[in-house]
Amino acid sequence: MRPCQTLVHAALIVTQDKERRILENASMAVTDGIVADLGPRHEMITCWQPRHEADFGRCLLLPGLVNAHTHSAMTFLRGLADDMPLMDWLNKRIFPVEQKLTPEIVRLGSLMGYAEMLRTGTTACVDMYIFEKEAMAAADQAGLRCLGGEVVFAFPSAAFPGPEAALEETRALAQKYAGHPRLSIAVNPHSVYTTTPEILAACRDLARELALPLHMHLAETAEETQICLHAHGKRPVACCRSLELLDGPCTLAHVVDVTPDELDFLAQRGAVAVHNISSNMKLASGASPVPAMLERGMPVALGTDGAASNNRLNMFTEMGRAALLHKLTGMDPTLLPAQTVLDMATLGGAAAMHDNRLGSLAVGKAADCVALDLAAPNMQPLYNAVSHLVYAATGMENRMTMIAGEIVYEDGKFTRFDYDALCREMTSIRDFVRRQAGLA
């Protein structure tokens, strides 16, 4: 018998491998944070000698979901500003509070965001915020995978006086996390309309120099397009194209107000689009033309955006809403079938992370997985596992979250931090935010 770190048993394993196999009454062997083998349980128990055994015999095991665009720390703003247009929401509520932030608020807000993700089946995220050093430290503490980086604005933030300092912070973070098994860094210009061509060029140059991906908001609303036309005489995608900003690996959040020609360009560049359906619905920003993206072969992922504009960080919510919205707006019930949406939340997310170890459970891939209880009322009876994951599951069926072979959440308990203490800290943060927003 071969030794392994952990042997995980499940009623079903949705592998998301190239054949999209679903294994019944199966087991997965994990060694050094990597999937060593998968197969029928009765065979695996005769082949592998584990140090630990995790029996989720009535559960469905699937690859951990990837939240491909979020601002994890913004849990501290959840419910602060609802039912407002994007620009009013940003300029009247969000940006003023963010100018008063402290590193500790960002650390705690991020940790709460990661707790929500781990609880609901997300194992990795692409994050962007201020004081991102604290967000990355929180991700390390929680055990999550994270592609993060300091957001770059043309104006001062609470963290830095200007874009030059934010880019230097990006450089420092890239050096700090080089070679880290779970954490990596991207260059994060906020958007075309909150930066300048010179700042975007500096972001491009740093990404090229350090071989980092680029992550930004792009073409989120028609209003953004008008702002860019007024300031630069070009639409947002054209601004990026003229600067060769998207010539390297890039993850683009929203991509709503785009033309067919712009989609052709983005597809040719291999850009990854992130569909943030809940946030776009709540802010009435519009919907990404996802079917048109997929027709062009564009990688498409799903993201929650921040809790201030969603208000959840739950990828099961995003899957269900994405599948339903496009059927409605396209007046076609065959658009975005369940398997396509699950692919977006897993394999598309891996593309957004620029990490081919993620997105599926196969030999040699990262042992990042979650276990959903099939005995939950909303999961009964079971005809089609993928259908249930997209249309029936809520994320609250999750019993276990494993990242790099380590169980970081199981049956209501987080293994790496004190959740009750975190809740007490969030109450203090709420009182601070109320005062800053003039709501106390």
Curated annotation (Swiss-Prot):
Task: List the molecular function annotations (GO) for this entry.
Answer: 5'-methylthioadenosine deaminase activity; metal ion binding; S-adenosylhomocysteine deaminase activity
Cofactor(s) annotated in UniProt: Zn(2+)
Record organism: Desulfovibrio desulfuricans (strain ATCC 27774 / DSM 6949 / MB)
Q: Which reaction does it catalyse?
A: S-adenosyl-L-homocysteine + H2O + H(+) = S-inosyl-L-homocysteine + NH4(+); S-methyl-5'-thioadenosine + H2O + H(+) = S-methyl-5'-thioinosine + NH4(+)
The enzyme class is hydrolase
The name this protein carries in UniProt is 5-methylthioadenosine/S-adenosylhomocysteine deaminase
The entry assigns this protein to a family as follows: Belongs to the metallo-dependent hydrolases superfamily. MTA/SAH deaminase family.
- Record keywords: Hydrolase, Metal-binding, Zinc
Protein residues bound to substrate: 98, 190, 220, 305
Q: Which InterPro entries match?
A: Amidohydro-rel, Deaminase_MtaD/DadD, Metal-dep_hydrolase_composite, Metal_Hydrolase, MTA/SAH_deaminase
Note on how the cofactor is bound: Binds 1 zinc ion per subunit.
Gene behind the chain: mtaD
